[in-house]
Each structure stands twice: as structure tokens, then as C-alpha cells.
């Protein structure tokens, strides 16, 4: 979002179709230890020669219940299982790509949602003392678009726009874990970003650019007396 010599700008991958093919489909499933499962799907579709789209989704779950060994105070080594270490995650993406006579446009929507637990520490003196039933929920959403067109041989325009919404909920409930204090925090952040870049070609060896950006970010929390930027 900022002008910098070291800035890196990544762009969404465009679908590629061979010949008259109109669909690309990729389905995958990964698995691992601790009941980990990770299915995914990518579907790319070509409506016509000018418009195409892609849908990408992924889900991941792991229980986080792995066994570990530690020595108790004045006792023998024991084996325990980590608790409250589960993670659930869902990602959804939908993008459209279009061509116009002298340019192109792109639009994308993205959603990420997750829930996870925070496992507690293993204490030698009192095994199982800290249950740590803390939980956290996250939601990240954004929609963005881009438009580029060569209006004249000497003038072109690139415009971008984006809206983003981020949400975090953290809960620590002493009714589930008496060793903790009650914490139930919500945080929300919204962002609007827009930019336009104009390119003027005066001579083949001489060109000028003019660009401008607008960005507005707001943050909110339900906590009393907490600063809201």
C-alpha cells in the first residue's frame, strides 16, 4: 500500500485453459498426525474468451492431542496428552478475470475463518493444574478489484480498490478453568483502500506517471476506555 523501493505486490494467479477446454478441477486431501485432515478444491471455469473465474476452498482440522513425557516432582516419569490444542480453519476464495478491448479487469473475494484453543503448561509439582480452556476465533474478509486500460497511445490508467474486515474474539472463562481470570474480548478492524496510477508517454524514451492513494483504517473494541484508532 505504500510507495517503497522494496515493496512487493502479489497478484492472483490467472486461470490457463488448453485449447477449447472450459474447466480445470483440482481436488486434494492431506492428512497427518494428531487427527490432521486438510481437504482442498480448486475449480477454474471459462465463460467465454473474455471472462473466466476461479473458486478455491480449503478446510483444515487437527486435534493437537499429542503425547509427551515429563518427570513429576518426587515421582516417576509420566506420559500426558496435550489438551485444548485443536485448530479448525476454513478458507474460501472467488475471483473473476475479464478482458476489454484495450485492457483488463479483475475482482476477488476472500474469507478466512478459524477457531483454536490454547493449551496450558505442564507443571511438575501439580500435573494438570493449568487446564487452559482459552479459545480464540478469527475472521478475515476482503473484496478487491483492479482495472487497467490503455485509453490512448499516450495515456493509460491503473485503478485498484479494496475493502477489508478483520475480527478477533478471545475468551478465557474461569468456569472452565479456575486458574484464569475472566476475559472476553472482541476486536474489529475495517480498511478501505483505493489507488489510481496514470501513465503519460510523451516520447518512446520519455514517460511520466502520476499516482495517488487513499487509505482509511478504523479499529474498534468493546473494552471500556480502550483507545479506538
What kind of feature is each model-predicted range?
Residues 206-229:
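Signature of Gram-negative outer-membrane beta-barrel scaffolds
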Residues 41-45, 92-98, 143-149, 194-200:
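Residues on the lipid-exposed face of transmembrane beta-strands in outer-membrane beta-barrel proteins
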Residues 2-4, 30, 35-39, 86-90, ...:
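Residues that define the transmembrane beta-barrel architecture of outer-membrane proteins
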Residues 33-36, 50-65, 84-92:
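Gram-negative/organellar outer-membrane beta-barrel architecture
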Residues 21-25, 37, 49-53, 90, ...:
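Outer-envelope beta-barrel architecture signal
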Residues 62-68, 79-89, 102-157, 163-189:
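Flexible loop and strand-edge segments within Gram-negative outer membrane beta-barrel domains
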Residues 27-31, 41, 55-61, 107-113, ...:
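Transmembrane beta-barrel strands of outer-membrane/channel proteins
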Residues 1-28, 37-43:
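N-terminal periplasmic accessory domains that precede
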